[in-house]
A protein has these predicted regions:
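C-terminal nucleotide
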Residues: 1-37, 42-48, 54-122, 169-182, ...
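Short, conserved acidic/polar surface loops in the N-terminal third of protein domains
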Residues: 90-92, 138-142
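Hydrophobic alpha-helical hairpins/lids featuring a short glycine-rich hinge
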Residues: 110, 128-134
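Alpha-helical scaffolds flanking conserved acidic
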Residues: 127-128, 167
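Short pre-catalytic strand/loop immediately N-terminal to key active-site residues, enriched for Gly-Thr
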Residues: 134-138, 316-317
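DPxDG-like acidic metal-binding loop motif
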Residues: 140-160, 164
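Glycine-rich active-site/cofactor-binding loop and its immediate structural neighborhood
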Residues: 326
């Protein structure tokens, strides 16, 4: 197989890489997220027409990218994906075609190649190892987290001082524009910034506002929330396409549900800041009832059964995470009934997933100290740089990266 091939090769990266000297190794990780309210209002064309708002937070489930740089004179990208159980190697300068195999990596190469002239001239190869704590299609934004981790690793390798807004927009561009994967903007921004955020989406700007929630409120919220895997994954593209079609057609039910969902995101943010944790269950349930009106296919009989049994067992409210059709349910419980809800979920074949809130976003670091011409330091935390660092959004509302 030629170096420019984009066909996966069993053992390809390991076979090529192990004979070349490793100059240095760097790693990145980006967190996944749970969305409390407003999901769907970040999906075009709704935010461009009416403005969107989302309340979400990141959790301790991550997507990882490890890059080893080889001085081999080949100029290749050697990829191993644990999630897809596949390996391949590509030329960093050749044209690449999309065929359903590691397309996210190929799109990242295409979009980021203009920033890599000096590195490409060196003819060094990169061994890329990718894995995630949750598979795609489970509603946690894992694909976008992986894309952000990829952008972060390449930014570190290229010594690019991109702001969090620019990194999030590059990840959005790779997924939504280059690959045409349907979806909104919240996932890329959540994975980049990390923490509890209230996000506002408009036609030409995104603003990320970190929420300062007291520790005791976070502890109570953590205790009363349950993350439950339903045992099914889903392809969300068709659901999102139907939602987009409803907005473009001006379908009143879709538009009204999205407007009310946006209002719930604002209300939930305010209740959290006031410390009114008890209100979250009711608002989650209201949001879930509205979400089912966005488009056909958001819920299924199995999901409805899960939710009904959880409510019977003591859940006050909850919602399906992601676009719909499968994945994870987020449930809010009375503290006395938490164990009963977990038993009800297990009885239906589901699984309660342990999680904790994560307050850092994208992180990159050196594993092995770089030699001359390598990255000089770790990438600063997105949260440390704040929400007004440039790119698409911030107080200036500057153009997209």
């Amino acid at each position: 197989m030629t170096a420019s091939s984009d066909r996966p090769t069993p053992g390809g990266p390991a076979a090529v890489a192990r004979h070349a000297p490793v100059l240095y190794t760097l790693r990145s990780k980006a967190p996944m997220r749970i969305s409390f309210a407003g999901g769907g209002t970040d999906v075009a064309p709704f935010p461009e027409q009416r403005g969107g708002a989302v309340l979400n937070c990141t959790i301790d489930k991550y997507a990882y990218a490890t890059a080893r740089v080889f001085d081999d004179g080949r100029g290749e990208l050697l990829v191993t994906s644990v999630d897809y159980d596949t390996s391949a190697h590509y030329s960093l300068t050749a044209d690449l075609s999309y065929n359903g195999e590691l397309d996210l990596v190929k799109a990242a190469i295409k979009v980021l190649r203009p920033y890599a002239h000096d590195r490409l001239a060196s003819k060094r190869s990169i061994g890329l190892f990718l894995h995630s704590d949750a598979p795609p299609g489970t509603g946690l934004g894992s694909s976008s987290a992986l894309c952000v981790a990829l952008v972060g690793a390449f930014a570190h390798y290229l010594n690019q001082p991109w702001t969090p807004y620019e990194i999030a927009e590059l990840a959005f561009r790779i997924e939504r524009e280059e690959l045409g994967i349907r979806g909104g903007r919240q996932d890329q921004y959540a994975a980049t910034f990390g923490g509890f955020n209230f996000m506002e989406f408009g036609p030409d700007r995104t603003v990320v506002a970190p929420l300062k929630i007291p520790r005791e409120i976070l502890n109570e919220l953590s205790y009363r929330l349950l993350l439950c895997y339903t045992g099914t994954t889903r392809y969300s593209g068709g659901i999102i396409e139907r939602q987009q079609a409803g907005v473009r057609a001006g379908r009143s039910e879709s538009l009204q549900a999205l407007e009310e969902t946006k209002a719930i995101a604002v209300a939930m943010k305010n209740e959290l800041l006031r410390g009114n944790v008890d209100e979250l269950g009711r608002l989650l349930d209201e949001g879930w009832q509205l979400k089912k009106r966005f488009a056909e296919g958001i819920t299924t009989p199995q999901i409805d059964a899960f939710y009904a049994k959880a409510r019977e067992a003591g859940a006050i409210g909850g919602k399906l995470l992601g676009a719909g059709g499968g994945g994870h349910l987020l449930l809010f419980c009375d503290y006395e009934r938490r164990a009963e809800v977990i038993r009800a979920v297990h009885a239906l074949g589901g699984e309660a997933i342990d999680f904790a809130f994560e307050f850092e976003g994208l992180q990159t670091w050196n594993v092995r100290p770089p030699g001359p011409g390598g990255p000089t330091s770790t990438t600063p935390s997105a949260r440390a740089r704040g929400p007004d660092s440039g790119g698409r959004g911030g107080s200036s509302g500057t153009s997209r990266a």
